[in-house]
Amino acid sequence: MDSDYNGSGLYAEGEERFGSIGSRFYGITRLIPTLRRFYSFVLRDVASYDYGSVLDVGSGTGFMLLSIAGSRENFRGLGIDPSPQMVARATSRSMKLGLNDRIAFRIGSSRSIPGNSNFDLIYSSLSFHHWKDREESIRSIMDRLNAGAHFVIYEITDDGSFNRKFVKSHLMSRQKFEDISSRLNLQADIKEENGYIRAAFKK
């Protein structure tokens, strides 16, 4: 895909778009205590899977994929995001960490995954709640999994705490994931922990 492509065609109608300001903001969200605990939850769970190739859908500034790469060496990873600004920041961070020989970032989306490679693990962290056509996206992603591989979604749930009141539209629930998996005729392995949720779909 052309590196000059602006990614505008990869957003579905109504999906939130992230430019230079948004990408800078997301670069500091890892400092927020709730999100630090969320990232720890994701890292622990990802470590339970066996994989040699990983795709991060909605990789943003690359924090999660690069964190995984920093703790595990024997895999190659690709992060995709429809925001060129996010991809640029992630690529720069990968190069500074010396991980760009095995971790790459490209413009793409859940419905438009660049290349033709399949993956041992595909995951999304704090991106799924933005997707407007979730079922189409899951179908597209499942097609890019190797046999026996997993697509894993990590999100935040409503744990009743005060701060959740301000981000209702960004929250997922067990019921939402169960409804989606039922419509797609897929089995979802759902795990909840301290206000965070993981839904895993196996090919």
Segments from the language model and where they lie:
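N-terminal, positively charged/glycine-rich alpha-helical extensions of SAM-dependent methyltransferases
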Residues: 1-23
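C-terminal alpha-helical "lid/dimerization" subdomain adjacent to the S-adenosyl-L-methionine
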Residues: 5-10, 152-201
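Class I SAM-dependent methyltransferase Rossmann-like catalytic core
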Residues: 20-33
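Conserved alpha-helix/loop element of class I SAM-dependent methyltransferases that forms part
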Residues: 33-50
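Class I SAM-dependent methyltransferase SAM/SAH-binding core
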Residues: 55-57, 61-111
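Short conserved loop adjoining the S-adenosyl-L-methionine
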Residues: 112-116
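A conserved beta-strand element that flanks and buttresses the S-adenosyl-L-methionine
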Residues: 123
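A short glycine-rich, Lys/Arg-flanked "PGG" loop and its adjoining helix->strand segment in the class I
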Residues: 136-147
